[in-house]
């Protein structure tokens, strides 16, 4: 479920205060027989009952105030989330003012509790869902959040956002069915996840978007904008420098501040983001006390760059947080829209040429392990040979998948020394020859055309280029021409939108309950959809069938089996060269902040969502800038 996963990656906390049904107000006649609930669970019961006070992992008495300064990478020229990923570069932090109907708890899997919505109802067959808005939900201009706002937002995203449009394509209509009620109708029954997906809809103010700006120009929800948008959330945009920095400030009269979804969260008075184009510069900014928090993605930096005076004096705290909320595939991903990558033997040959074990020793200080699944680190990852329900599912596509799916456990080639690399390159060359290539004058050429095999790795940061440069000599030993092209964030986004690349570094985060987002990742329908996450260009009937099997599962065991089957077929088609994972979030912070004693199991660091500014600590660690 991608939208929920995105909120988890942001560390967004969620909670709900729902009154007893007697206080919901008069129901419309059509809704009299509805069973209203305070939350949704994909499988099983909700942890938190109706009327709960706050989430277990927050401090309801957390001090309020203070400023936190964070890092963002790249640039931004847009605040309109409707066209994010299609036009311009969206600013970080839009979730601070854009609220959703429902929101997720960070200590549960695939549950939602109402935020803008106070209650939700759906029939047993999941063919529709109805949300009831809270009577006190307000925009920052004081106007109420209405069903018309929800319907406007749904239509805007469905018509203009390729990614969300793909999620909502099975929602046939949204209509007002009561003073505060909105009903969404689906194109068929049985899709248990659709009510939750609709609940993750960011709600926009219809009256603001259909109005005019300070210059009298009519606003356009289909275009980028740098006009600070009207929101309903706990923060508003106070100040910004395009492409450089953002300052969000807490809304004093925020309508939802006493909701138990909000209690203990969003405790800072200001949240600042400083943009950097280079991770090395960002690290130096952190060392210089220009930002408060840093997530470290470099193994080398983690091993060598944090022995500076503030760390030794315990003014900077280094801490790792377990990753339990997502599975991940990080990879060198092929664009199989290009003819040279259509043959899976070619793609597999690239994996034989990648010596992860040697790279791990030389570059990563031995910190990483190889990824062997598209759902790495979860119970959803396939292993061994298929059996039981997974085997039954795979048998439904047996004639459409590689035979190894049933006979051979997937594993990546092992390197780590020169003999192992020579053996792997020998296997790679055999695969190339089987695919119609040959060696001529030390060059790998197409046996029919004589054209040398050439490949370009497209990256957007120096760290990724470093990985490519390590990989490059092995490919060149096979007679391949290898180029690495590093471009800025805007160029990178534009080339991705146009599918203009050979190989990119790509990753897919996976929730613990996969569902409709798998269509956006791997389906034939998404392969030619601009803005989709099917960056590989997969058009595979077996995978399409398995995706639908994942979406329409009826219980957790069936979901796990169907996901393992999908994982196995993806792996044996060699769409990517899997990279590596650490399994933890590495973080560094200036010691001015505190957090609850009990951290949410699936919330990563949950910073800054459930943390707060600690004045006593800050007095001992005064800011240098």
Residue map of PLM features:
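Extracellular/periplasmic solute-recognition and catalytic clefts
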Residues: 173-176, 238-249, 274-338, 348-349, ...
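Ligand-site clamp/hinge motif
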Residues: 134, 223, 254-306, 348, ...
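Gly/Pro-rich hinge or "lid" segments in bacterial periplasmic/extracellular proteins
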Residues: 92-110, 155, 199-265, 269-270, ...
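Surface-exposed binding/hinge segments that line
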Residues: 132, 166-214, 232-241, 386-398
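Aromatic-rich, solvent-exposed beta-strand/loop patch
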Residues: 114-121, 125, 140, 145, ...
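Aromatic- and charge-enriched surface segment that lines or borders ligand/interaction sites
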Residues: 58, 62, 85-92, 119-163, ...
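N-terminal lobe/hinge region of extracytoplasmic solute-binding protein
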Residues: 33-125, 155, 230
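Detector for C-terminal structural segments
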Residues: 8, 13-21, 72-74, 96, ...
């Amino acid at each position: 479920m991608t939208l929920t996963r995105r909120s988890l990656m942001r560390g967004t906390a969620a909670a709900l205060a729902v009154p007893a049904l007697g206080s919901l107000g008069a129901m419309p006649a059509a809704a009299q027989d509805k069973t209203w609930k305070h939350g949704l669970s994909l499988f099983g019961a909700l942890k938190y009952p109706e009327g709960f006070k706050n989430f277990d992992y927050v401090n309801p008495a957390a001090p309020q105030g203070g400023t936190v300064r964070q890092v963002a990478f790249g640039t931004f020229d847009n605040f309109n989330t409707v066209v994010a990923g299609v036009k311009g570069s969206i600013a970080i932090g839009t979730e601070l003012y854009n609220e959703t109907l429902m929101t997720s708890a960070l200590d549960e899997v695939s549950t939602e509790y109402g935020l803008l919505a106070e209650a939700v109802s759906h029939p047993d067959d999941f063919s529709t869902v109805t949300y009831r808005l809270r009577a006190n939900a307000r925009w920052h201009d004081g106007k109420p959040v209405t069903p018309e706002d929800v319907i406007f937002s749904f239509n805007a995203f469905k018509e203009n956002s390729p990614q969300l449009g793909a999620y909502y394509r099975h929602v046939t209509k949204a209509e007002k069915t009561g003073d505060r009620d909105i009903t969404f109708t689906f194109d068929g029954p049985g899709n248990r996840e659709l009510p939750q997906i609709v609940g993750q809809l960011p709600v926009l103010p219809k009256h603001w978007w259909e109005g005019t700006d300070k210059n009298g120009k009519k606003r356009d929800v289909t275009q980028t904008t740098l006009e600070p948008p009207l929101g309903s959330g706990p923060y508003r945009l106070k100040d910004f420098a395009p492409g450089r920095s953002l300052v969000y400030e807490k809304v004093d009269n925020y309508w939802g501040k006493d909701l138990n979804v909000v209690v203990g969260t969003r405790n800072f008075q200001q949240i600042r983001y400083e943009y950097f184009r280079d991770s090395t510069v960002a690290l130096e900014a952190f060392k210089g006390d220009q930002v408060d928090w840093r997530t470290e993605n470099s193994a080398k930096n983690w091993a060598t760059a944090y022995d500076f005076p503030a760390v030794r004096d315990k003014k900077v705290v280094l801490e790792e947080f377990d990753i339990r909320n997502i599975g991940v595939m990080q990879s060198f991903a092929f664009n199989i829209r290009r003819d040279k990558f259509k043959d899976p033997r070619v793609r597999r040959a690239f994996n034989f040429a990648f010596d992860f074990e040697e790279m791990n020793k030389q570059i990563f200080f031995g910190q990483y392990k190889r990824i062997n699944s598209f759902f790495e680190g979860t119970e959803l990852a396939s292993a061994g040979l298929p059996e039981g329900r997974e085997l039954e599912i795979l048998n439904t596509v047996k004639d459409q998948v590689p035979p190894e799916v049933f006979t051979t456990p997937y594993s990546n080639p092992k390197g780590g020394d020169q003999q192992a690399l020579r053996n792997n390159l020998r296997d790679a060359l055999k695969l190339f020859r089987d695919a119609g290539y040959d060696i001529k004058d030390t060059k790998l050429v197409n046996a029919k055309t004589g054209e040398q095999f050439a490949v370009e790795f497209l990256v957007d940061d120096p760290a990724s280029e470093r990985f490519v440069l390590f990989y490059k000599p092995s490919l060149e030993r096979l007679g391949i021409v290898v180029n690495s092209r590093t471009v800025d964030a805007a160029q990178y986004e534009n080339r991705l939108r146009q599918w203009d690349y050979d190989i990119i570094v790509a990753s897919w985060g996976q929730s613990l309950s996969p569902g409709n987002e798998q269509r956006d990742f791997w389906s034939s329908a998404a392969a030619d959809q601009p803005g989709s996450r099917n960056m590989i260009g997969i058009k595979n009937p077996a995978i399409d069938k398995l995706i639908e099997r994942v979406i329409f599962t009826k219980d957790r065991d069936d979901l796990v089996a169907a996901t393992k089957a999908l994982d196995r077929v993806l792996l044996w088609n060699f769409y990517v060269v899997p990279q590596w994972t650490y399994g933890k979030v590495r973080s560094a912070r200036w010691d001015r902040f505190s957090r609850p004693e009990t951290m949410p199991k699936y919330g990563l660091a949950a910073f800054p969502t459930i943390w707060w500014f600690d004045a006593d600590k800050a007095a001992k660690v005064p800011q240098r800038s």
